[in-house]
């Protein structure tokens, strides 16, 4: 768990990128393999820019999704009040062990995906690149093949969590924004026109919706 990852120095970010990419780290010339499963969950504060280091594109691409955490609703905030200010000590409870998680990951990869869903993934990701067919010069740089891989895994996992035997195009549309938005940047003209990445993704989704 990397808290406020954009406050880490570029050298630290580079070391993390090696771990995410190669599943091992190197210390004093010695290689140390990381345990399996290995996951990186990271947070960053989008409101404070002073003292931060923007993550490079290569590192952003290593994250499966980017999820914005909004303010909690009233009921959730009420639970937070009572659960964090009482005298009872709250302890984290394990929901699964490593073996179960690895088995679940394997099951996700075995879930069948229909041709229509595959084509929707390819069409959406390829449309999010600069100078894509029908593009209107909004995108400065866009998602690579890893975005297609991530979207394929994400829709499979969502279907499995919902108790379905295969993902649907609705899964592709619902997960497009969190999978793609950190893998894209807009042109200066698009930003000057007030466009945002979520706006552009919503526009791209209409082509396959």
Language-model features: where?
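Non-catalytic, well-ordered alpha-helical scaffold segments
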Residues: 14, 61, 78, 115, ...
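Conserved AAA+ ATPase small/helical "lid" subdomain
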Residues: 91-148
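Short alpha-helical scaffolding segments that buttress acidic/His motifs in well-ordered protein cores
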Residues: 80-81, 121, 175-180
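Alpha-helix N-cap and coil->helix boundary residues
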Residues: 55, 76, 96, 112, ...
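Canonical AAA+ ATPase core
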Residues: 7-8, 12-15, 20-98, 102-111, ...
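Walker B beta-strand of ABC/ABC-like P-loop ATPase nucleotide-binding domains
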Residues: 1-2
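C-terminal engagement/docking regions of AAA+ P-loop ATPases
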Residues: 130-209
């Amino acid at each position: 768990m990397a808290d406020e990852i954009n406050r880490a120095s570029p050298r630290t970010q580079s070391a993390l990128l090696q771990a995410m990419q190669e599943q091992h780290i190197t210390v004093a010339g010695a290689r140390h393999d990381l345990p399996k499963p290995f996951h990186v969950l990271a947070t960053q504060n989008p409101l404070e820019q002073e003292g931060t280091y923007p993550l490079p594109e290569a590192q952003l691409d290593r994250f499966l999704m980017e999820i914005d955490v909004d303010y909690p609703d009233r009921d959730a905030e009420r639970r937070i009040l009572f659960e964090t200010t009482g005298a009872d000590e709250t302890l984290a409870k394990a929901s699964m062990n490593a073996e179960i998680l690895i088995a679940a990951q394997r099951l996700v990869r075995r879930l069948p995906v229909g041709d229509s869903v595959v084509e929707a993934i390819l069409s959406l990701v390829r449309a999010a690149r600069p100078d894509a067919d029908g593009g209107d010069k909004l995108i400065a740089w866009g998602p690579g093949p890893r975005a297609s891989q991530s979207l394929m895994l994400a829709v499979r996992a969502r279907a499995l969590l919902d108790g379905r035997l295969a993902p649907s195009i609705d899964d592709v549309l619902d997960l497009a924004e969190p999978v793609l938005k950190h893998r894209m940047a807009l042109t200066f003209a698009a930003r000057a026109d007030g466009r945002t990445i979520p706006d552009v993704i919503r526009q791209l989704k209409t082509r396959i919706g």
